[in-house]
């Protein structure tokens, strides 16, 4: 999230740089100190007027450019700036002068996103400049793979600025889905008694603020800082150090949003080792696996409390997913997560070809099913014909068997009759012979 302190720091650095340039009286740079982008380590900290004078040599105004042309010019300027810094670093490795163009070369390594530190001040000013350089390290990275939404591509820079101005500073800020950003309200709530700064004009706004408010990129939210429990003793040793907040796992009560400064139930370092600085410390919890914040809460019954888990070193966006976690999910599972960053999903060919392929596939499936049904029907008819033939053969065999059985019985009965008829005449002849014999021979 772009804080108000960073904005004020950028304005003070620009004013100090202009005063330093007038004091040195360099030739060709009296009208504007930022004629060369190589003197800035991050072009996103420049205002639009400074970037206009440094880049547009042909006199073309940014207001007449489309947003596509504006982003292309920013990327070209960033590449030139990086090339100049590399060349200057290569030249400075051989011979490093004590003071060059009013800049202190010892502070050039303050960070890629920071603004260069001017010399000519005391040691305290150098320390303050180093701190401001570290604060400015949250500049926008190169968005070379970013695709603008279709309505935003057709608009000019002046039209986008007018929409931002009408919206009261929020404009089209927020994510690509159209949700407006609430950074101004959060900053006012955090700063409390600070007086509201005046609304910057078009030329005074930095490139980073303009791109964020226009909706080209998202804001990176700051790390949540939970308030201490009022029921506990106000002991300074229970305060969590700032260095340990990056490795903090907290479970917050009363809200589904982990950025809400609620009550922390348990904190700890994922490595499992205690960290104590300055004689104080905090109670360690057992090692917890890095969790993913989904923005929603878990309720236990009607009156349950909502809880959320925060992972280390993963700034949570407005939709509840960290930028690094989204990239890891897309790279691990091969899923195109471009829709979360405003990019449209690439369609596999024209719609007509897709429909034609589907129709051909449906026709092939129908033909295959018809062939299968025809084969099944032919097999059934063949089985029925074989069954009828077997039935006829079975009937013929049964009839032949019955005829054979009848003939066999008939022959048996005929044989029995032929055996019983010759015995009767023999018995009669014997009886006759016995009756003719005389009883005595006289």
Swiss-Prot record:
Report residue spans for region: Basic motif. 357-376
Some GO term, biological process aspect, for this entry: which one?
Answer: response to abscisic acid
Q: What happens when the gene is disrupted?
A: Exhibits abscisic acid (ABA) insensitivity.
Q: Transmembrane segments in this chain: where? A: none
State if Coiled coil is listed as a keyword.
no
Question: Keywords for this entry?
Answer: Abscisic acid signaling pathway, Activator, DNA-binding, Isopeptide bond, Nucleus, Phosphoprotein, Transcription, Transcription regulation, Ubl conjugation
Q: Where is this region: Leucine-zipper?
A: 383-404
The Low complexity compositionally biased stretches are: 99-109, 177-193
Q: Briefly state the modifications made to the protein after translation.
A: Phosphorylated by SRK2D and SRK2I in vitro. Ubiquitinated. AFP1, KEG and RPN10 mediate its proteasome-dependent degradation. Its stability or degradation plays a central role in abscisic acid response. Sumoylated at Lys-391 by SIZ1. Sumoylation protects ABI5 from proteasome degradation, attenuating ABA signaling and sensitivity to ABA.
Q: Name one GO molecular function term.
A: transcription cis-regulatory region binding
Q: Which Pfam families match?
A: bZIP_1 (PF00170)
- The UniProt feature for the cross-link Glycyl lysine isopeptide (Lys-Gly) (interchain with G-Cter in SUMO) gives its location as 391
Query: What does the record note on quaternary structure?
Result: DNA-binding homodimer. DNA-binding heterodimer with AREB3/DPBF3 or EEL/DPBF4. Interacts with ABI3, KEG, the mediator subunit MED25, and the AFP proteins AFP1, AFP2, AFP3 and AFP4. Interacts with TAP46. Interacts with the 36 kDa catalytic subunit (subunit C) of PP2A. Interacts with FYPP1 and FYPP3. Interacts with FREE1 (via C-terminus).
Q: What is this protein called?
A: Protein ABSCISIC ACID-INSENSITIVE 5
Q: What is the scientific name of the source organism?
A: Arabidopsis thaliana (Mouse-ear cress)
């Amino acid at each position: 999230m772009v804080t108000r302190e960073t904005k004020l720091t950028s304005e003070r650095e620009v004013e100090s740089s202009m005063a330093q340039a007038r004091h040195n009286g360099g030739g060709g740079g009296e009208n504007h100190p930022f004629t060369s982008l190589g003197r800035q380590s991050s072009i996103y900290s420049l205002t639009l007027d400074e970037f206009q004078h440094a880049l547009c040599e042909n006199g073309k105004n940014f207001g007449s450019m489309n947003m596509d042309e504006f982003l292309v010019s920013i990327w070209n300027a960033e590449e030139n700036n990086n090339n100049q810094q590399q060349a200057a670093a290569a030249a400075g490795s051989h011979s490093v002068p004590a003071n060059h163009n009013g800049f202190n070369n010892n502070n050039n390594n303050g960070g890629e996103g920071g603004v260069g530190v001017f010399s000519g001040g005391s040691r305290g000013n150098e320390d303050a400049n180093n701190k401001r350089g570290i604060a400015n390290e949250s500049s926008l990275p190169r968005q070379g793979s970013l695709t603008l939404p279709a309505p935003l591509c057709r608009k000019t820079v002046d039209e986008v600025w007018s929409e931002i101005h009408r919206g009261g500073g929020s404009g089209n800020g927020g994510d690509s889905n159209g949700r407006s950003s609430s950074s101004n309200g959060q900053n006012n709530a955090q700063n409390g008694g600070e007086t509201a700064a005046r609304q910057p004009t078009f030329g005074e706004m930095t490139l980073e603020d303009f791109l964020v408010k226009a909706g080209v990129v998202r804001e990176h939210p700051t790390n949540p800082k939970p308030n201490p429990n009022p029921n506990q003793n106000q002991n300074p040793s229970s305060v969590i150090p700032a260095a340990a907040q990056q490795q903090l796992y907290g479970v917050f009560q009363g809200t589904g949003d982990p950025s809400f400064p609620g009550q922390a139930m348990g904190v700890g370092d994922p490595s499992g080792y205690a960290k104590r600085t300055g004689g104080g410390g905090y109670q360690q919890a057992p090692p917890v696996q890095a969790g993913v914040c989904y923005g929603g809460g878990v309720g236990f019954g009607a009156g349950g409390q909502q809880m959320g888990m925060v992972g280390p070193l993963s700034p949570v966006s407005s939709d509840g997913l960290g930028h690094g976690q989204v990239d890891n999910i897309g790279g691990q599972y091969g899923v195109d997560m471009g829709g979360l960053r405003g990019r449209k999903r690439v369609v596999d060919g024209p719609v007509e070809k897709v429909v034609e392929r589907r129709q051909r596939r449906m026709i092939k499936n129908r033909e295959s099913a018809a062939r299968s049904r025809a084969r099944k029907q032919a097999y059934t008819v063949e089985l029925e014909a074989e069954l009828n033939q077997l039935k006829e053969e079975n009937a013929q065999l049964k009839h032949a068997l019955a005829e054979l059985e009848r003939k066999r019985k008939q022959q048996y009965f005929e044989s029995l009759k032929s055996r019983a008829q010759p015995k009767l005449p023999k018995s009669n002849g014997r009886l006759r012979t016995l009756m003719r014999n005389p009883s005595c021979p006289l």
